[in-house]
Amino acid sequence: MNPNQKIITIGSICMVVGIISLILQIGNIISIWISHSIQTGNQNHTGICNQGIITYNVVAGQDSTSVILTGNSSLCPIRGWAIHSKDNGIRIGSKGDVFVIREPFISCSHLECRTFFLTQGALLNDKHSNGTVKDRSPYRALMSCPVGEAPSPYNSRFESVAWSASACHDGMGWLTIGISGPDNGAVAVLKYNGIITETIKSWRKKILRTQESECTCVNGSCFTIMTDGPSNGLASYKIFKIEKGKVTKSIELNAPNSHYEECSCYPDTGKVMCVCRDNWHGSNRPWVSFDQNLDYQIGYICSGVFGDNPRPKDGPGSCGPVSADGANGVKGFSYRYGNGVWIGRTKSDSSRHGFEMIWDPNGWTETDSRFSVRQDVVAMTDRSGYSGSFVQHPELTGLDCMRPCFWVELIRGRPEEETIWTSGSIISFCGVNSDTVDWSWPDGAELPFTIDK
């Protein structure tokens, strides 16, 4: 083969290899394009199977499963309380990025439970945590994270600018209520699935405030209670009925000898029961029960096992306010079972220390101080704080009843400890009809932090 023939042969081979390579590249590009078109095309697909038509509605980035939480079930029968969650937020925050918070609470949809909390716009062990003992500031916000996780910038979702708040799920979306603004003109901003739907202006111009725990949803409507007026005297109390973020009805309670703040509410057989804080003149807790038309009844827990703090030693109770040590108070809760009542309270009668659950089988209607069950969850030597109720609907648990649960805030820092900040962690428990245990689940953080020295 002469040199010219060699050149022609080599050139021909190179040309064939090049053409094959080009065809393969074109095929690869076509394959990628087809695959991409399938993934990003119309997300409403209709398929035919055995002559039946099935339509799939795919919602990108969002779970499209929805139900209506009816709230028609009665509370589950229980014998005690099982530990549900503990976030250890202060302990983790000594080294990690954890928000300075207070007023945490828990609320559950039919799919998950979330911890909601009011941040101070600051992290633990950072200079901006200085002075966070203050309740109301423009830096506070309602945020949420998965239950049991320490609240950090990496796992938390912004909900609303707020220094007082509530939130609940109706089975189709989250309702959040965030109150912010000056003491003499605060505004509650209502959001449904993150979109502003309504606002409520302070009507007494004296620190509009709400529950600091979950609102309550029944048959697609959600209910909350707000207070406006003095914390040490008669104020104004309103119940709001809300549907998909819009107020459809409201009433003002006629309660001239009662004081309702920071109510802990739950659904029970289609009605709503709220147990609240009397900061005016009661060491027992006031309650209000209402139906979906906002027809209501009011009263006080009669038991001589008193639920507020400060409070007198247990003794003769009253179905009206017990005035001994009745001034001031702390957010709390109870669960009614017929004539009986589970009472959650601090173990100390003069400070926010310890926590216990007490079953008084006649305490809703009788004034004696006899009880049959006491379960300790935080020791007297450890700090506690606010507490509140939340429920797990049958749509979440698969039970045929409403599971009662509660949370306890574990406050740390100022004014009791030598720190520049005030924050808290949270523990929670749910009612079970099986074995439980007495123990203490304290916050457990070793103070002071580096920033405090």
From Swiss-Prot:
Binding-site residues for substrate, renumbered to this chain: 102, 136, 261-262, 277, 352
Sequence intervals crossing the membrane: 7-27
Cofactor: Ca(2+)
A Pfam cross-reference name: Neur
Effect the entry attributes to changing residue 133 to S: In strain: A/NWS/33
Lineage top rank: taxon: Viruses
Phenotypic consequence of residue 373 to M: In strain: A/WSN/33
Entry's EC annotation: 3.2.1.18
Intravirion topological domain residue ranges: 1-6
Enzyme class of the recorded protein, top EC level: hydrolase
Virion surface-side positions: 28-453
Residues at the active site: 135 (proton donor/acceptor), 386 (nucleophile)
GO molecular function: exo-alpha-sialidase activity; metal ion binding
Phenotype for residue 57 to K: In strain: A/WSN/33
Biological process terms in GO annotation: carbohydrate metabolic process; viral budding from plasma membrane
Record text on subunit structure and interactions: Homotetramer.
Function: Unlike other strains, A/WSN/33 neuraminidase binds and activates plasminogen into plasmin in the vicinity of HA so that activated plasmin cleaves HA rendering the virus infectious. Catalyzes the removal of terminal sialic acid residues from viral and cellular glycoconjugates. Cleaves off the terminal sialic acids on the glycosylated HA during virus budding to facilitate virus release. Additionally helps virus spread through the circulation by further removing sialic acids from the cell surface. These cleavages prevent self-aggregation and ensure the efficient spread of the progeny virus from cell to cell. Otherwise, infection would be limited to one round of replication.
Protein name: Neuraminidase
Organism: Influenza A virus (strain A/Wilson-Smith/1933 H1N1)
